[in-house]
């Protein structure tokens, strides 16, 4: 395969606009899976997604030029799904299933376009909102994050000369390859790329994906990035995200409905998908409360993705719950995906090996680890915790608690109401870097 010289490309900016988002498929696969369900079941729900910089010490509006940001957002607005992309979505097999996307949904999707954005700045931060039907606004999450992340990378490299850029990418490649060699020592490990939203750049993500494909072979199970899956003949991977229970909970009218909201999401999901896509994301309002109130049928699902508890503690709690429900954990799947670095992956692998099926969704540490790679110290390569979350549904505030209080999102009064209702049992505060 012909690999572009990334350093040369970064250095030679002779074009008017170098698009960060090249396709509406440059997103996570679970956004399309969720979109089909949202379009089918919740066509009249309006939501707001909001960019949230959890690393307040990093002033994004000082690092990133507003004109460049608007140009990239405007370019994303201009994108439509191409005929080739629609044929691929219709004809490809995903998770062993053909026609996972129904013809009526694809007919609607071919004319899809992102809704307008609202951008202002305050105290060194960008205030970025996306309003509109849930079936449209949801698709801004990944492009918005990838645009901010790559613009930050470009700003960091703006004053590097050609030689310094060569050194930067040579060191980053060596750093990445040393991680690949570390993973090769773990028999039967399953690794996938979950690094789109906070990647250094699209070209760098592609290089990392191809490095994993070359380096660990069948242990590399695929990528969450739909465009890269299509381009590199990999599996497109992903299930569902916190936005589903966040929105459904925000729409409830009483405590009984609020209690049932996380499980209503699973029932909706099961109407659309099955088999290996039956993965539970338990931590939106706290894993402990979710497990305590879960109907027995939840234990029949394929697996869980513990997303905010420490991986070993979170995995052990779910294994214990499976055993309480009479299930053999060795037949179940745990997908670990929260702030993983290669050492955490290795430790978690050794801890659970032989006790449960495992897979690791490797994100920012895979696609944006440039710390120490530049010839001189560049602060803007330091880790940034940036998210784009649903904050309102039909005018009501949406909340995410999570097992880590540092990740709590929402209106303070609503957060307290949710804490009073769901509790905070077994919440563990951990620093968040990504």
From Swiss-Prot:
Enzyme class: ligase
Domain of life according to the entry: Bacteria
Catalyzed reactions per annotation: nicotinate + 5-phospho-alpha-D-ribose 1-diphosphate + ATP + H2O = nicotinate beta-D-ribonucleotide + ADP + phosphate + diphosphate
Keywords, alphabetical: Ligase, Phosphoprotein, Pyridine nucleotide biosynthesis
Disulfide cysteine pairs (residue numbers): none
Known pathway: Cofactor biosynthesis; NAD(+) biosynthesis; nicotinate D-ribonucleotide from nicotinate: step 1/1
GO biological processes: NAD biosynthetic process via the salvage pathway
Residue numbers carrying Phosphohistidine: 242
GO molecular function term, any single one: nicotinate phosphoribosyltransferase activity
PTM (free text): Transiently phosphorylated on a His residue during the reaction cycle. Phosphorylation strongly increases the affinity for substrates and increases the rate of nicotinate D-ribonucleotide production. Dephosphorylation regenerates the low-affinity form of the enzyme, leading to product release.
GO cellular component: cytosol
One Pfam family linked to the record: NAPRTase
EC number: 6.3.4.21
Family: Belongs to the NAPRTase family.
Function: Catalyzes the synthesis of beta-nicotinate D-ribonucleotide from nicotinate and 5-phospho-D-ribose 1-phosphate at the expense of ATP.
Protein name: Nicotinate phosphoribosyltransferase
Organism: Bartonella quintana (strain Toulouse)
Classification of source organism: Bacteria, Pseudomonadati, Pseudomonadota, Alphaproteobacteria, Hyphomicrobiales
Name of the gene: pncB
